[in-house]
């Protein structure tokens, strides 16, 4: 509800931060218990909840050792520092129009000549992004190899599907090829599933058998309480811990005073143990499939050159057909004026999509009736646009 008492169906869900839903009773109970009964909201010491959460993350994603932060952005930043220190290489390779929060190095896109340049809106960047980063188009394995072959890439940091420029899915074999290339050119692989966690209980990493050296996630795993985390493979963790010359205890540039605090850990345990379960994921994915199929049917009914992609519990349409397979092509398909009109029309009738793009996300309490309501209003939008 808003301050005027208007009720909304929320498909934005805090741009994934509320994928567990709003005010989940299990999460509320855990938070209240921590605040009122257990106390110690920030202690700089681990809790039993932290141990449980790390074990659950290992079960889900297959990664051995975990360290916590307050955002996935910070988890990415700290992972970048570690891989640079371990490899001795200065640059990180990204996909054009990727999303890794506000990490400076990630705000790079391919330029018209095929090289890198600052992404539009990269305000106040500390250095030219090409000094710290390299870039390739998603699904362009030749471009990926070209950049890795330059020999200065410490790691590829990637979403296994682009999520902030539409949902750009990997072409068959692409993710496996990237992993093979990182090994060929002695670079590490960091997979950020902060958004793509919607794919499955164990994200795309478990679903698709991915093998990252570093795994990053945040947003949804604590039910809306600030959290992020990065995990290291057994091999990489041993390399990091074996580097006694790295000051990782105090001023190493990795870690934070509030990271892993008891409140975040209590919320994360409740979310992972009782809300984002295998059963709820199955329900959420089924609803997203229904959303995708019914929205696509509207495109067909009105002969619109639009398309929609689904990634587990999320789906998103673009004003292009077929759906773009690179970040640049997806960016070129954007129509911000049309997007704003659709979002405003829906919002004025009680339906929220994710701002800045057309993503709909399901949570455990989303219903078929919610999707049907969206479709009813969305068809009204289409009719107005088509002059029907």
Regions found by a protein language model. Give the residues of each.
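Conserved N-terminal phosphate-binding loop of PLP-dependent enzymes in the Aspartate aminotransferase
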Residues: 1-388
């Amino acid at each position: 509800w808003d301050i005027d008492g208007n009720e909304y169906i929320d498909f934005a869900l805090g741009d994934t931060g509320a994928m567990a839903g709003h005010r989940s009773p299990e999460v509320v109970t855990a938070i209240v218990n921590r605040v009122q009964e257990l106390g110690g909201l920030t202690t700089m010491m681990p809790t039993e909840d932290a141990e449980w959460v790390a074990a659950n993350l290992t079960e889900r994603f297959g990664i051995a050792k975990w360290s916590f932060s307050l955002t996935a952005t910070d988890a990415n930043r700290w992972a970048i520092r570690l891989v640079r220190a371990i490899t001795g290489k200065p640059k990180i390779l990204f996909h054009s129009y990727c999303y890794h929060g506000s990490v400076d190095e990630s705000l790079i896109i391919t330029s018209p000549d095929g090289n890198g340049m600052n992404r539009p809106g990269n305000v106040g960047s500390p250095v030219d992004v090409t000094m710290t980063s390299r870039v390739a188009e998603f699904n362009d394995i030749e471009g990926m190899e070209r950049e890795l072959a330059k020999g200065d890439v410490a790691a590829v940091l990637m979403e296994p599907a682009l999520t902030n420029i539409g949902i750009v899915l990997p072409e068959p074999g692409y993710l496996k090829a990237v992993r093979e290339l990182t090994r060929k050119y002695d670079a590490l692989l960091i997979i950020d599933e902060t958004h793509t966690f919607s794919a499955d209980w164990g994200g795309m990493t478990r679903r698709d058998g991915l093998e990252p050296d570093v795994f990053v996630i945040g947003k949804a795993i604590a039910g809306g309480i600030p959290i992020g985390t990065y995990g290291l493979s057994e091999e990489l963790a041993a390399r990091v811990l074996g580097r006694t010359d790295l000051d990782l205890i105090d001023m190493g540039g990795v870690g934070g005073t509030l990271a892993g605090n008891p409140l975040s850990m209590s919320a994360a345990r409740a979310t992972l143990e009782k809300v984002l379960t295998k059963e709820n994921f199955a329900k959420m994915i089924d609803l997203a499939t229904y959303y995708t199929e019914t929205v696509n049917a509207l495109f067909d009914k009105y002969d619109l050159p639009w398309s929609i992609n689904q990634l587990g519990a999320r789906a998103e349409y673009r004003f292009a057909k077929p759906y773009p397979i690179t970040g640049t092509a997806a960016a070129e398909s954007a129509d911000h004026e049309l997007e704003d009109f659709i979002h405003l029309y829906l919002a004025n009738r009680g339906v929220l999509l994710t701002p800045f793009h057309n993503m709909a996300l399901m949570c455990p309490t989303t219903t078929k009736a919610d999707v049907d309501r969206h479709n009813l209003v969305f068809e009204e939008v289409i009719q107005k646009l088509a002059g029907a």
